Design a protein with these regions (language model features):
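An active-site-proximal "capping" alpha-helix that borders the catalytic cofactor pocket
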Residues: 1-2
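C-terminal recognition in membrane/secretory proteostasis and scaffolding
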Residues: 6-289
Length: 289
């Protein structure tokens, strides 16, 4: 969309940051490789359950970030002479009239041939590892600053770069669950790994009734939590099927899982050249939007 002119650089960076945020918020990124996500798509990704955010990663979203990192790596290592575009065009030329598909690792070999770069170590990290993606360092090489911070609220999907003190966000208390409104009640759809809800013993499909003796609803849940602090312990009443249960839940601070991107003001000449080649605009054009 950026290349076609439908959106500008700021909007593109916002969308990209929101994709990164979505991946960062799933513990499954640390448990399932991108290759396994693709392999198990029909048995796991398209049959998701309440534990999926803890065990799976999307080969669509993480895959798009892997492609981004590959593209920027090629641009950097070739001093802007090659990019992922060259690889895709080379594949198109090679297989245009071929009745045969691309082999499992053949794509990687062709990418090395076309770019003239050793890429195997990068492919291993992007496709067959659960290591964190090197987003910040790679984007810095093309003059983009990445900010990783806690969310401002449950509605914060990322993309907004904050210039103020972020320490206040680190003191924002969270339950570590995802919820949905169910006939006016708060139903837990997911209990996230390492969160306060999981530590307290809550489970997906539990229906919250009260916090510290006060009725909880979809309308007041966030406000009830916002008045507390990390480390506070709440008495939680919830129904699990038809059984009323009680839990002692100790609130945890919000994790740094929200991404924002912006053009770096202090980018050097090499970074600016790579950034222009990637975004297709000069620094002056990008900042004037």
């Amino acid at each position: 969309m950026l290349r076609s002119g439908l959106i500008g650089v700021d909007d593109y960076l916002k969308l990209l940051a929101q994709t990164m945020t979505g991946v960062q918020r799933g513990a499954g990124r640390l448990k399932q490789t991108l290759e396994d996500s693709s392999l198990d798509a029909w048995s796991k990704y398209y049959r998701q359950d309440e534990n999926s955010p803890n065990s799976l990663v999307s080969y669509y979203t993480k895959g798009s970030l892997a492609a981004l990192l590959l593209d920027l790596h090629i641009r950097q290592q070739s001093s802007g002479r090659k990019s992922l575009d060259d690889v895709m065009y080379g594949l198109w030329q090679q297989y245009l009239d071929s009745p045969r598909g691309v082999g499992e690792t053949e794509w990687e070999q062709i990418a090395e041939q076309i770019t003239g770069l050793p890429l195997q170590a990068l492919f291993e990290r992007l496709l067959r590892s659960t290591d964190e993606l090197p987003l910040a360092s790679t984007l810095a090489s093309v003059g983009i600053e990445l900010q990783l911070r806690p969310a401002e609220s449950n509605a914060d999907k990322g993309g907004k770069y904050l210039n103020d003190d972020l320490s206040r966000l680190a003191q924002r208390p969270v339950l570590g669950v995802r919820t949905a409104s169910d006939a006016g009640a708060v139903k837990l759809t997911h209990v996230l790994d390492g969160g306060a809800g999981q530590a307290a013993g809550l489970a997906a499909n539990d229906v919250l009734i009260a916090l510290d003796g006060l009725r909880v609803t979809p309308a007041n849940l966030d406000k009830m939590i916002e008045t507390r602090s990390p480390g506070d312990t709440l008495l939680v009443h919830a129904f699990r099927r038809d059984e009323l249960m009680t839990f002692n839940l100790t609130l945890k601070p919000a994790a740094a899982d929200t991404v924002a991107l912006r053009l770096a003001d202090q980018a050097d000449a090499a970074q600016l050249a790579l950034r222009q080649g990637w975004l297709g605009q000069t620094d002056k054009q990008a900042k004037s939007e």
